[in-house]
Amino acid sequence: MKGVPRTVAVVGVPGTGKTTVCRILSGMVRHTYINYGELMLRVAGEWNLAETLEDLFKLPMDQQHLIWLEAAHRIRRLDYVLMDLHGLDRSPLGYLISLPVDIISPDIIVILESDPQSILWRRMADSKMRVRESLESLREHMEMLRTSMFVCSAVLGSVVSIVENHDPEEAALDILGIIEAAWAGDTTP
């Protein structure tokens, strides 16, 4: 790949620090920063279906899916996008890939990871965090996210990178380095 990557998807399990890292990164790149969940909430609000994330996730799955599709179509119309999303969500029925690969084809998929224990601590400290998992189920979720993003990458022809989030500033710089390497066409390990 050579040239500025048009779409960069930063994915990770809830509590891994995606939003913090993406907000820092958005000040370093020309891409428009989009938090997928916030965009879905905006769409739901415009359609008079939900005003809070809690309301959004109480909607029937078919309505959530329509909102998810509308958000994807809005993102697809943008030129340079930095997307912040989970990539894989856990539901009562199992896992759902939340990267809309039929509509958006990221040039780069960055899987942001943190130590699972740190993620659990962040989740407990965040009163808005609705996801509750055991350490074992969190590790499974992280592994399933990796697997699903590599499958998406194979289907889309995207590059996948894994970045550890020990420090948000450093993680943002690591992702910036990946974007710059793609821009330069550098695919050497």
Curated annotation (Swiss-Prot):
MF terms in GO: ATP binding; kinase activity
Keywords: ATP-binding, Kinase, Nucleotide-binding, Transferase
Residue positions binding ATP: G12, V13, P14, G15, T16, G17, K18, T19, T20
Keyword Cell membrane: no
Gene3D superfamilies assigned: P-loop containing nucleotide triphosphate hydrolases
Protein origin, superkingdom: Archaea
One Pfam family this sequence matches: AAA_17
Family (UniProt): Belongs to the archaeal adenylate kinase family.
Protein name: Adenylate kinase homolog MTH_1663
Organism: Methanothermobacter thermautotrophicus (strain ATCC 29096 / DSM 1053 / JCM 10044 / NBRC 100330 / Delta H)
